[in-house]
Amino acid sequence: MERIKELRDLMSQSRTREILTKTTVDHMAIIKKYTSGRQEKNPALRMKWMMAMKYPITADKRIIEMIPERNEQGQTLWSKTNDAGSDRVMVSPLAVTWWNRNGPTTSAVHYPKVYKTYFEKVERLKHGTFGPVHFRNQVKIRRRVDINPGHADLSAKEAQDVIMEVVFPNEVGARILTSESQLTITKEKKEELQDCKIAPLMVAYMLERELVRKTRFLPVAGGTSSVYIEVLHLTQGTCWEQMYTPGGEVRNDDVDQSLIIAARNIVRRATVSADPLASLLEMCHSTQIGGIRMVDILRQNPTEEQAVDICKAAMGLRISSSFSFGGFTFKRTSGSSVKKEEEVLTGNLQTLKIRVHEGYEEFTMVGRRATAILRKATRRLIQLIVSGRDEQSIAEAIIVAMVFSQEDCMIKAVRGDLNFVNRANQRLNPMHQLLRHFQKDAKVLFQNWGIEPIDNVMGMIGILPDMTPSTEMSLRGVRVSKMGVDEYSSTERVVVSIDRFLRVRDQRGNVLLSPEEVSETQGTEKLTITYSSSMMWEINGPESVLVNTYQWIIRNWETVKIQWSQDPTMLYNKMEFEPFQSLVPKAARGQYSGFVRTLFQQMRDVLGTFDTVQIIKLLPFAAAPPEQSRMQFSSLTVNVRGSGMRILVRGNSPVFNYNKATKRLTVLGKDAGALTEDPDEGTAGVESAVLRGFLILGKEDKRYGPALSINELSNLAKGEKANVLIGQGDVVLVMKRKRDSSILTDSQTATKRIRMAIN
């Protein structure tokens, strides 16, 4: 108070006022503070001070020719004095008004293109429907959400290169546009923005909105896709929510949704193959989502979901350090533990080997419909605070936490044997056995857990074993809260390793993810997912497997044929025949395979019995491990259309029909492609007959000496190579076969291989 009085007295003296208004500020520190750097230090003051002046704006000299000196009201629009320190003119705010009303107009054609994201937002809001407002407590939890709908998924660096190339094509600086999406976008935008008069900087800002995903950590109670987040301020408050249905979808949300579905399908399929990791990688690399390669999407898309993260880990990408159990994402917030193997007995006296976490730890658990804070010690749950959308969701979270706590009373609550298996028919690990058991029925678990009286704490209530709320009693250590638990905010990613069974571990060896954690929820993808891998043929059912298998053989017939005669075992082991096995009755697989392999060997041994159509028809049956038996078959059964259908060994059937006239194959009435047979098959030329017993390796190789005549060949030892002069003076490199059994086939492949070697 004293100080203020003193200042008032000082200000009443005219001398003080004069000093303050006339004296220059010459203290270096102050000058530095307000003038260093381009950042305005006091924007509000600056704005007030500028607008109080008559001509606060500077403009290019050319403006004088374009704007009159005075407007209709006779107010001056620009000053004749130049701006100090530049060759621009000083202009009044009134000049802006005049320009907006009377200035030149330009074509508006580029506006919707540059401000695309805004125009699209208006459309979505116009067609969206807002429902009633409900007043209720909102359980919001902070999640990392996408805040700009309609963006591509380029990294900041990739987008920067595209923007520079589109907006400032003549600027120097190395720009490398490598990814497919970069090139497509650049081409498209250059065409759209030809002769665009909008300020380049503005165009650059708008392009950034279109190309890069922007995320924020926001409290959300409902939908998290970007078309809901853009209206977050309209749909939920502290105590109210308004129903809203978006008036349109955006590609980025569709990509996220389709990516999750593709990843889940791929992980589920990989789990049941002989080498899950190799299969998973093969499928990720051969799958496209909405016409873009899945691996490109995985590299750019930050979606965190169990299956997506397993695919990322397999590709060597970093993922979040949190781990998944029972569909909840766990993040340790404090404490530490060491793991020890321990044997425990269930209520059914079954022995389980579990890895016990010894030590005090605190975790946050975040699921789709419930969240919780868990404090635990060695095999003991100390406290669990849950919040969720409904009774069911809360129960799910409690079960997961109880199992995770590894408490003895939970293990003793097991009734019956634990023998859950995964899709590949392998037993689940003990922790997942327990989880599945109680997810099926948790009555005994809740009854045996024990209850305790509770204190009255604001915002918290108790929950009884039958999952009803109570203010007096609660399950031991468990409370239900009105407040949600925020998702883990950090976007930090860690290096992980993955084993061939798709278990993902951090560098300390903790398991973060495994295929058991992948949701079984089925959904319909918004964008077309194209799985080129043979492993995904079965996703559309048995018929698709049948058609795809035969299409594959026909497409690759040239190489299949050579392998059929020279390295059949390698051919039989091709993964493309794996899906087909599920169509062959289990009991018959081995017998069919043995029969077909014997038949093929006879074809190889007896010249002239090479029957293309029959080889194609029977080849998939030879892929199963063969049983040696003398059985002969005239037809082979496949299970399609809900029953066994027959494929005739000799002749056509509804399943496999080859039309000699059109040379086309139909499988179950669907076209499977055309056969291009060698015209000289069966009447192979003299060279091929003479070269029987030799493998043609390719063009002449000078290291093996001068060319021999065909007659001199007989002196070669088995496995020896030589150049040979054939037919029209061409020279090819051959090797004498090590085995005699395959001699007869050479004449079929020789003609073609000679042709290939010469060309």
UniProtKB/Swiss-Prot annotation:
Gene name of the encoded protein: PB2
InterPro entries xref list: Flu_PB2_2nd, Flu_PB2_6th, Flu_PB2_C, Flu_PB2_CAP-bd, Flu_PB2_middle, Flu_PB2_N, INV_PB2, PB2_helical
Compartments, as annotated in UniProt: Virion; Host nucleus
An example molecular function term from Gene Ontology annotations: RNA-directed RNA polymerase activity
The organism's place on the tree of life at top rank: Viruses
GO biological process: 7-methylguanosine mRNA capping; cap snatching; DNA-templated transcription; symbiont-mediated suppression of host gene expression; symbiont-mediated suppression of host mRNA transcription via inhibition of RNA polymerase II activity; viral RNA genome replication
Marked site (Avian adaptation) residue numbers: 627
Record's protein name: Polymerase basic protein 2
Keywords, in A-Z order: Cap snatching, Eukaryotic host gene expression shutoff by virus, Eukaryotic host transcription shutoff by virus, Host gene expression shutoff by virus, Host nucleus, Host-virus interaction, Inhibition of host RNA polymerase II by virus, mRNA capping, mRNA processing, Viral transcription, Virion
Sequence similarity: Belongs to the influenza viruses PB2 family.
Protein task: Plays an essential role in transcription initiation and cap-stealing mechanism, in which cellular capped pre-mRNAs are used to generate primers for viral transcription. Recognizes and binds the 7-methylguanosine-containing cap of the target pre-RNA which is subsequently cleaved after 10-13 nucleotides by the viral protein PA. Plays a role in the initiation of the viral genome replication and modulates the activity of the ribonucleoprotein (RNP) complex.
Native species: Influenza A virus (strain A/Chicken/Hong Kong/YU22/2002 H5N1 genotype Z)
An example Gene Ontology CC term for this record: host cell nucleus
N-terminal signal peptide: none
SUPFAM superfamilies listed in its UniProt record: PB2 C-terminal domain-like
Motif Nuclear localization signal boundaries: 736-739
Keyword Cell membrane on entry: no
Subunit details: Influenza RNA polymerase is composed of three subunits: PB1, PB2 and PA. Interacts (via N-terminus) with PB1 (via C-terminus). Interacts with nucleoprotein NP (via N-terminus).
Coarse class of the protein's main subcellular location: virion
Keyword field contains Iron-sulfur: no
